[in-house]
Amino acid sequence: MHKYVTIDDIYKMIELLPDEKQNPVDETGDCLYTNEDGDHCIAGEIIRMLGYDLPDFDDFQNTIPLGELIDNLHANDFDDEAVEMLHIGQKVADRLTHAGDPLAWAMAKRDMVLFFNRSRKEEIAQRRLQAGH
C-alpha cells in the first residue's frame, strides 16, 4: 500500500533528479514514460521513485496522458496538487526535449519548485486570513 502523495513528497524527489537530461521519445517524436533502455521521463522517474511501477516500453500506456496513467496505476492516493506539479514538470520537459534543450529537466524542476513555492505561500496566506491576521 502506498502512502498519500503530496507536493511535499514530489518536492523531495525533485532534489534527487539530474539537471542535464531530456525526456525519452519514440521514433515518431512522442514522449515516453519508459524507453527501450528503461530510462523514464521526469514525471515517470518521480512516480517510480515513489514506489509505483511504470509501463514498459511496448505497453500501450507508455504514451497516455499523465492523469490517465496515475488512474491506471491505481494511484488515487496522489492529491490534486501533486498531480498538477507532475503535470507542470512533464509539460515543460516534453516541450524542451522537443526543442533539443539538454537542460530540459533543469527547467522542468525549476517550474515545479515555483509551483511548490506558490502553493506554500497561498497556504500560509489562507492560514493567516483564517486566524484573523
Predicted regions and their residues:
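Short intrinsically disordered terminal tails
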Residues: M1, A125-H133
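Short, charged/polar N-terminal "headpieces" of proteins
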Residues: M1-E36
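Short runs of predominantly hydrophobic/aromatic residues within well-ordered alpha helices
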Residues: I7-I10, D39-A43, L66, M85
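Hydrophobic/aromatic-lined pockets within catalytic cores
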Residues: E15-P18, I47, G51
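Catalytic phosphate/metal-binding cores of nucleic-acid and nucleotide-processing enzymes, i.e., regions
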Residues: N23-G29, L50-N117, E123-R127
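Active-site nucleophilic cysteine motif
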Residues: T34-M49
